[in-house]
């Protein structure tokens, strides 16, 4: 679709769009911001993989799934606030986002692949908008959430979990 396009800088996807093809914006090296509408439920695999200048993502309240490598190598991304609708973050979703230092997860998330934040070396903590007891029910599959990164703590609304 737009993969490898160098002219795109900002994308505001129309609210009528319900689906975007896998890898559609892959390696769009000048893309800096994206607004994802409420109608999009799945951020498909590799959708923004390699968008090295992407520094702003506004997620619609309908997003439920973040796919494999969805934001891999988005090296300018510093903050990610996932809406309450997100239930699943796939493997390597934010792999090698070397500037990522803040992530906020919704309380009703079910699965965060342990490899989702591999090589996000500035990310030392995750903000979880649920309780410590609720965090215990979040699956990281077979890999711990601090796999190949520097995450040391999960900040919950009622305290911290050191890992």
Question: Where are the predicted features?
Answer:
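Structural signature of tandem-repeat unit edges
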Residues: 5-19, 29-42, 52-65, 75-88, ...
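A structural signal for leucine-rich repeat
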Residues: 118, 138-143
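Consensus positions within tandem repeat domains that build extended binding/scaffold surfaces
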Residues: 1-3, 21-26, 44-49, 67-72, ...
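Short mixed-charge
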Residues: 145-147
């Amino acid at each position: 679709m737009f993969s490898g396009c160098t002219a795109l800088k900002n994308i505001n996807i129309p609210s009528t769009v319900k689906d975007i093809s896998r890898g559609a914006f892959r390696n769009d090296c000048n893309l800096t911001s994206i607004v994802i509408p409420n109608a999009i439920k799945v951020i498909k695999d590799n959708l923004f993989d390699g968008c090295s200048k992407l520094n702003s993502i506004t997620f619609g309240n309908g997003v439920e799934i973040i796919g494999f490598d969805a934001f891999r190598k988005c090296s300018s991304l510093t903050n990610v606030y996932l809406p309450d609708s997100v239930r699943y973050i796939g493997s390597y979703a934010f792999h090698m986002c070397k500037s990522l230092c803040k992530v906020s997860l919704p309380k009703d998330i079910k699965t965060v692949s342990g490899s989702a934040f591999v090589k996000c070396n500035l990310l030392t903590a995750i903000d979880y908008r649920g309780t410590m007891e609720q965090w215990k029910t979040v699956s990281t599959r077979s890999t711990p959430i601090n796999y190949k990164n520097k995450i040391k703590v999960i900040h919950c609304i009622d305290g911290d979990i050191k890992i």
